[in-house]
Amino acid sequence: MKILTIIGARPQFIKASVVSKAIIEQQTLSEIIVHTGQHFDANMSEIFFEQLGIPKPDYQLDIHGGTHGQMTGRMLMEIEDVILKEKPHRVLVYGDTNSTLAGALAASKLHVPIAHIEAGLRSFNMRMPEEINRILTDQVSDILFCPTRVAIDNLKNEGFERKAAKIVNVGDVMQDSALFFAQRATSPIGLASQDGFILATLHRAENTDDPVRLTSIVEALNEIQINVAPVVLPLHPRTRGVIERLGLKLEVQVIDPVGYLEMIWLLQRSGLVLTDSGGVQKEAFFFGKPCVTMRDQTEWVELVTCGANVLVGAARDMIVESARTSLGKTIQDDGQLYGGGQASSRIAEYLAKL
């Protein structure tokens, strides 16, 4: 069976790397990889693929920039051309990006079956572009590979049991990736802090595009640096520019954006993770670190339920107090919430039996 995999963001490459390895092990499966170009940066170079052992894409569409509609529309057109040329038996998409939706829509309109990895996730916040993407992708997919029990419950609540789609609980491929690459972790350049620091990330538009929320978060980070523990903040130039334009000053240790292997290194040595990233919430759990999430909702409600994650929004006092009480807390994956690192093999084995 020929599988056409659509990816466009760096996290999707990292997830796809372990699934592609599992697909190769199945003699009845072959894979064509399409990179839409949604996340365009220097780190998506040949060195990036070699460092992580990620298969190089068969197609590079180089589509990035513009509005959500412009980007998705251009992707839809070019992915359709690839599907018509390659004639795959199935299209495989990951997560909730514009690349995900474009790949799913292109396949659906050409009547090619779709498998969605990370299906069933919901933040219940329709202002998030990702929420729209994941809901629409689930609707047109016929195999829904869910990472958690909560994701399956979400699909059941939306009536998917009455549809022809197959719902499969495989676990989370992000855990597979984290465990696989943990031994390759490398330290970032210019880090001055000792182990036990607080690792912070800040990039989500709901925080960086809202001056009130961003000001509150910056003030909280500065207070934590002074009164709780040293804070290490890998920061994208765009976010740094927004902070400077608001006249705010960060007192924490700001470092340049880091790659995946450097991020794992930081996670392994931190005492707490403070983030607004969906993926980093889980990665903190994979490495046994408590997490404080600066968002009003999360797709990973099971982490809040089990006490590994605290949702605090952007309120300064809540961020500071939660950081103080969570720092150094022991987190154990007793229940194997995310499949224990076997999701990719389960996905490949399921596809091979079709």
UniProtKB/Swiss-Prot annotation:
UniProt name for this protein: UDP-2,3-diacetamido-2,3-dideoxy-D-glucuronate 2-epimerase
Q: What does this protein do?
A: Plays a role in the biosynthesis of B-band O antigen for serotype O5. Catalyzes the epimerization of UDP-2,3-diacetamido-2,3-dideoxy-alpha-D-glucuronic acid (UDP-alpha-D-GlcNAc3NAcA) to UDP-2,3-diacetamido-2,3-dideoxy-alpha-D-mannuronic acid (UDP-alpha-D-ManNAc3NAcA). Exhibits high specificity towards the substrate as UDP-alpha-D-GlcNAc, UDP-alpha-D-GlcNAcA (UDP-2-acetamido-2-deoxy-alpha-D-glucuronic acid) and UDP-alpha-D-GlcNAc3NAc (UDP-2,3-diacetamido-2,3-dideoxy-alpha-D-glucose) cannot act as substrates.
Q: Which cysteines link up through disulfide bonds?
A: none
Question: How does its activity depend on thermal conditions?
Answer: Optimum temperature is 30-37 degrees Celsius.
Please name the top-level EC class of this enzyme. isomerase
Enzyme Commission (EC) number: 5.1.3.23
What's this protein's family per the entry?
Belongs to the UDP-N-acetylglucosamine 2-epimerase family.
Q: In which pathway does it act?
A: Bacterial outer membrane biogenesis; LPS O-antigen biosynthesis
For this protein, the record's Pfam families field holds: Epimerase_2 (PF02350)
Q: Which reaction does it catalyse?
A: UDP-2,3-diacetamido-2,3-dideoxy-alpha-D-glucuronate = UDP-2,3-diacetamido-2,3-dideoxy-alpha-D-mannuronate
User: InterPro entries under this entry?
Assistant: UDP_GlcNAc_Epimerase_2_dom (IPR003331), WecB-like (IPR029767)
UniProt-recorded Gene Ontology molecular function terms: UDP-glucuronate 4-epimerase activity; UDP-N-acetylglucosamine 2-epimerase activity
The gene it comes from is wbpI
Q: How does activity depend on pH?
A: Optimum pH is 6.0.
Keywords in alphabetical order: Cell wall biogenesis/degradation, Isomerase, Lipopolysaccharide biosynthesis
Q: Which GO terms describe its biological process?
A: cell wall organization; O antigen biosynthetic process; polysaccharide biosynthetic process
Q: Which Gene3D superfamilies match?
A: Glycogen Phosphorylase B
